From Swiss-Prot:
Belongs to the SEC23/SEC24 family. SEC24 subfamily. GO terms for biological process: COPII-coated vesicle cargo loading; intracellular protein transport. The keyword Ubl conjugation does not apply. Keywords: Cytoplasm, Cytoplasmic vesicle, Endoplasmic reticulum, ER-Golgi transport, Golgi apparatus, Membrane, Metal-binding, Protein transport, Transport, Zinc. It is a peripheral membrane protein. Its main location: cytoplasm. One of its GO terms (molecular function) is SNARE binding. Component of the coat protein complex II (COPII) which promotes the formation of transport vesicles from the endoplasmic reticulum (ER). The coat has two main functions, the physical deformation of the endoplasmic reticulum membrane into vesicles and the selection of cargo molecules. InterPro entries: ADF-H/Gelsolin-like_dom_sf, Gelsolin-like_dom, Gelsolin-like_dom_sf, Sec23/24_helical_dom, Sec23/24_helical_dom_sf, Sec23/24_trunk_dom, Sec23_24_beta_S, SEC23_SEC24_subfamily. SUPFAM superfamilies: beta-sandwich domain of Sec23/24 (SSF81995), C-terminal, gelsolin-like domain of Sec23/24 (SSF82754), Helical domain of Sec23/24 (SSF81811), vWA-like (SSF53300), Zn-finger domain of Sec23/24 (SSF82919). It comes from Candida glabrata (strain ATCC 2001 / BCRC 20586 / JCM 3761 / NBRC 0622 / NRRL Y-65 / CBS 138) (Yeast). It is found in: Cytoplasm; Cytoplasmic vesicle, COPII-coated vesicle membrane; Endoplasmic reticulum membrane; Golgi apparatus membrane. This is Protein transport protein SEC24-1. Zn(2+) binds at C213, C216, C235, C238.
Amino acid sequence: MSHHKRRVYPQAQFGLAQAGQTGYQDVQQPGVLPSQANYQEPVPLVTPIQEVLNNQIDQTADSLHNMQLHNVPDFNQPLQGQLNGPQSPALYQNYNENGMNNYNAAFGNGGTSVKQVNQLYPIDLLSDLPPPIKDLGLPPPPINLSPDIMSVPSDKSNASPDYIRSTLNAVPKTNSLLKKTKLPFALVIKPYQHLNDDVNAPPLNEECLIVRCRRCRSYINPFAKFIEQGRRWRCNFCRLANDLPMQFDQSSIDTNIVNRLDRTEIKNAVMEYVAPKEYTVRPPPPSIYTFIIDVSQNAIKNGLFVSTIETLKQQLEYLPNRDNRTKISIILVDHALHILSIPADDVSNKFRILDVADIDEPYIPLPNSLVVSLSRCKQNVQLALEKIKQLFEINVSTKFALGPALRTAQKLIGGVGGKLIVISASLPNAGIGSLQRRNESGVSGTTKESSQLLSCQDSFYKTFTVECSKTQITIDLFLASDDYVDVATLSNLPRYTAGQTHFYPGYNASNISDFNKFTTEFSKHITMDISFETVMRARGSTGLKTSAFYGHFFNRSSDLCAFSTMPRDQSYVFDISIEDTITTDYCYFQVAVLLSLNNGQRRIRVITLALPTTQSISEVFACVDQQAVAAQITQRAVQKANSSSIDDARDLIQKTTLDILSTYKKELVVTNTGGVVPLKLSTNLRILPLLMHALMKHMAFRAGVVPSDHRAYSLNVLESVPIKSLITSIYPSIYSMHDMGDDCGYTDETGNVILPECINDTAILMEKYGLYLIDNGSELFLWVGGEAVPELLSDVFGVPEMSQVPVGKHDLFRVEGSQFNERVCNIIDQLRTSDDTTVYKTLYIVSGPTINDSFSQGTRELASLRMWAATAFVEDNIMKTLSYREFLEKMKKEVSK
């Protein structure tokens, strides 16, 4: 029982509104909250293959007392038998909350292990409404591995889904079976989990002894087998027997014998090596940050220039500088280039600004004094930043020579490499790379949108990235303007150099919310750890090969992805093809990342994943990771939108969903000639149609007129966003605040704030007297119902009437003496707090319409806010699109043809 006092906010005293009111369903649906979804008892489907398998299992089970057939792990006994008896779909989905793999095995009297499989639990999607969105918080289906394939069975022997996820946790043995399923086969990879490398770092092998297969070059891992009395090891990727170096059983500190099973690489599927000299072409370079700052009239007027300078001053000491070799340079840009020459602190306190007026043939004056040591020049950099803020505060130049600035910066640091961080409020309009405003009228929302508005306007922005990749340079963009800046063209710079684009439309530094968002994201970006001179390769065992790559990097060869610098907040998707029939019971993937750290070390991060193989289509479907599938389809849709059209991207999403549903019906559903034909799918896939339906309503793909900068930015973000953020972006989280539990808003034993349960993304569940918090991954909307009682308004906002609620872009003020206000603020802070992303979510306060109003009534700003917030109701008929039920009805009709 909670000790926190809960205040109950009664429903306002009013009658039901007239039917058909825009945006709200006036008759509330009792008992349709997601937590109250009616689950049916599972009825496993029986295919010929499965029938044979079940008969075999039944015979074996007669002699066993602890046989488990339904794959509901007992995580208190991780290496013992599982529970008996049939389980509900809800229990089937209730995997270990940490998402670790299932290594349980049931053993017969003779000691022979019996292969476990995930069972199919079919549901009717149309009877399973509203969709059970709690599934979005579940880990992937268990990976069923026998402990005897690992040298040291443990939950660390196979890679965590935090690092790598496969769309299929049971891999078809043949390409024909894969094609038959119509399911995508891909890996979703996130090499780093935190912005700071010191947080939960994986085990490190510092011995510089690296054991690799001499044929396929995979690294020894927990699934390698020691053979011939331990003198050799068999590669689990290509099956080659390799010699084991004598040092493998010796301590690197002394000559004592060590237990090889205690070695880091044998116990851990995710680990790092300190790389020996043969992995180094040149000594690890120092970290170099070059800031290209717009000082034109636009940047001065909207406050971006001052915001940048103030943030840099505060964050200089927090730039990664572990080895005291970090360097910095600053280039100010308008119609000319203004490069800062800063002396060491112990030499002089006077800096110079070197002006380069010839932007067609820019030269670099005094190059040795333009890229300076942060440790030796920190005080003078601070002084210079304060001085230039005064010098440029009344600049009237309207030009912005970005192209010449980029070329100059590339010459400055090209011998070493590093980061170019561009902060701009203007469309480049001087020198090479000048851009023109594109005419969006009559083009936006048509089939010509991609080719005329979302394409690269100037080839410079693609060819320059090739030069940057050769010289190990990454480009990041911070674009903040209330006017057109051609995100579609500029975003090519980060896309092919492993960078990121940050976009702040309508930026105004005098608005504290705008200022906080920019400064927070800019600060987190420049202070997060990064890797230099990085390459990443994914290997598959015999028969498996990487075939396509998605993300922000430069693809150097057929399977090698190059990152001039690797950030900590991006993920990558690699498609997998089955080249030859897989003859083994298990297959393997290994991701290797070779990198240089800010501490001067060269390292190799190795991530190894083992998956079972199968010839059963039912087992393949039972092991699909629906969120990983959603990530892969999103990448293909982004590629289609950029190369073809938005319409084609939506068609791809819809066709892929239809193909999966049709295949499931054809291969796994027993034909029922009588009664209504249901739209069947397995429980582990039941949220995928919802995600695909919502994805088509995302700003990146929705039909209609969308400003091209916003569309291009949305597409760019989807290219690199990790799964967790991707799902929130596709299907926003809506928290019901007015009736949240007593403990919500307070911290738990781990220090995290307890969040309310989410409700479905539909206005049907939005009470007109309620308070809701909407999180779409980029922004937060605090929605207060138009009929909210005065007590709620007083407790949350400190005002007695709706007319006094501060609508718009505002942070929620603290109300003295109100515990409820404190809890709401704590929840908002929790949703903004994350050490794995640089995103800071701006809060918008929105008041809903009263009983006699519609969405469009009120001020223009309020009506726009309501419509923007309402885009989160993806299950409804928003923006002239189908509701989720209508979408399923359409799918059912197509499947039944």
